[in-house]
């Protein structure tokens, strides 16, 4: 994918959480082809490896340039794990200049299938009253505490 703008980020280090997902991998690519060294943080090592390989190959094909993109497996809601990952990133790529907190998601059990509560749907299995408190907490931890 060609980036429709030019920005010189040479010498900058960017960290992108949730970077193996569709949106954040595109952001990571834009940063990398603009010259930044990019650390992608995600939970799934295989997915990270696939995304980093794809971004590196795309940059060679589309821009005839080498980019620096590295994947780091980490759960952003585990502060100790996150701090360890950051120390590794700092030693390999340098201190963070650009941070994109893109990790996030949702889970069944934390959402309803009904947009508005109506009396006749009050007892539905997927209403507000049947939400799973633990799933809601997991989603909040990821989407709020993880950023």
What spans do the regions from the language model cover?
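Flexible N-terminal pre-Rossmann segment of NAD(P)-dependent oxidoreductases
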Residues: 1-15, 129
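Conserved glycine-rich cofactor-binding loop
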Residues: 13, 20-22
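Conserved glycine-rich Rossmann-like NAD(P)H-binding loop of the short-chain dehydrogenase/reductase
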Residues: 36-51
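The beta1-alpha1 cofactor-binding region of Rossmann-like NAD(H)/NADP(H)-dependent oxidoreductases
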Residues: 45-46, 72-85, 133
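Rossmann-fold cofactor-recognition segment
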Residues: 58-80
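A glycine-rich helix->loop->beta "capping" turn
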Residues: 63-68, 88-101, 106-108, 129-132
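Substrate-binding pocket helix/loop in short-chain dehydrogenase/reductase
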Residues: 110-128, 132-137
């Amino acid at each position: 994918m060609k980036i429709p703008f030019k920005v010189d980020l040479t010498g900058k280090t960017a960290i992108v959480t949730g970077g193996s997902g569709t949106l954040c991998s595109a952001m990571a690519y834009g940063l990398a082809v603009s010259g930044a060294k990019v650390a992608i943080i995600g939970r799934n090592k295989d997915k990270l490896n696939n995304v980093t390989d794809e971004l590196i190959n795309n940059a060679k094909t589309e821009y005839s340039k080498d980019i620096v993109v590295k994947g780091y497996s980490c759960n952003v809601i585990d502060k100790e794990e996150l701090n360890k990952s950051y120390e590794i990133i700092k030693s390999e790529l340098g201190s963070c200049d650009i941070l994109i907190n893109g990790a996030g998601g949702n889970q069944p059990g934390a959402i309803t299938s009904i947009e508005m509560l109506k009396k006749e749907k009050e007892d539905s299995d997927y209403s507000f009253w049947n939400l799973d408190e633990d799933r809601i907490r997991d989603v909040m931890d990821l989407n709020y505490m993880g950023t």
